[in-house]
Amino acid sequence: IDMDKYTLDAVLRKGAELVKRKGIKCLVIDPFNKVRDINGNESGDVNVYTLEYLSKIEIFAKKYDVLVIVVAHPTKMYKGTDGKIEEPTMYNIKGGGEWYDASYHGLLVHRDYEAQTVKAKVLKVKFQNLGENGAEAHFSWERRSGSFVPLADINNDDPMPWEDV
């Protein structure tokens, strides 16, 4: 494996090329810890490194008008007193304070292995007209179709949180 292809600068260069050649509107970096910023943070401070990393992504996103999604897994999560794995926050990602402060949005995807469900939860929305902090949706995995299915039926007549009632 040529690890030089997996640096942040190389991924952003390829992203810029794809914007120009294919007109992409979304770039996904998955997982964050495998796409290293080898030119950043000489001090070794993880918070400075994370801030520089996210700043490069923000500059790229604004320059090319592209949505950039960064998949960042939390550090090891432990079971709570109820025996379930605790729900992570943005602070559970290495460099966590910077993840919360520097990002525009934060979305949690968390599995409940016992109940065999998945929760999608909004952890941060910078602009309130784009969503609601703390909003949740719950899903189950449907093996036959290979997709997530909402646990509760959605009523299309219900107003969205940002719509005036």
Predicted feature descriptions by range:
Residues K5-L27, N41, S55-Y64, K76-V165:
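C-terminal regions of RecA-like/P-loop NTPase motor modules
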Residues D30-P31:
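Walker B catalytic acidic pair
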Residues R36-D45:
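Conserved ATPase-coupling elements of RecA-like P-loop NTPase cores
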Residues V46-N47, E86:
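A generic secondary-structure micro-motif detector
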Residues V66, V70-H73:
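Conserved H-loop
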Residues L8, N47-L51:
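Non-membrane alpha-helical structural segments and their capping/turn regions in soluble enzymes
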Residues K34, T75-K76:
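Signature of the SF2 helicase/ATPase Hel1-core->accessory helical subdomain module
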